[in-house]
Amino acid sequence: MKNPVLIHKHLIIRAEANRVPTDEEQLQHWMREFIDSIDMKILMGPYVKYCKMEGNRGITGIAVIETSHIAIHVWDEPNPALMQIDVYSCAEFDPYVIADKIKNDFDVVKLDYKYLNRETGLKPIRLKK
């Protein structure tokens, strides 16, 4: 039976940014604040780890939220840095609020996204603004 309250929204963001988190504590703090700012509840994490491998150097953070997960990957070797952000939730969220926060917090110079309804497939959602 279908749950009328349950939804499946997935926001995938690729951003190039000038000011990104470069240490574990900094990203962990940002993720907590970010999750709170979009009215989500953390169940586990955020778990954050810095990878020092040349060519793949950067930081990854993952949090389990009450309605699914949030992940962020930052490669800090390129200039501007590359960020990949994944927000999946079974509750409503505003993709504009998320995009604006990322743009402002990280001095984003380029941002691309896909917003999907995954309830019965991988259907793109057209944003109106």
Give each language-model segment a name:
Residues M1-K129:
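Polybasic/polar functional segments that serve as interface/processing modules
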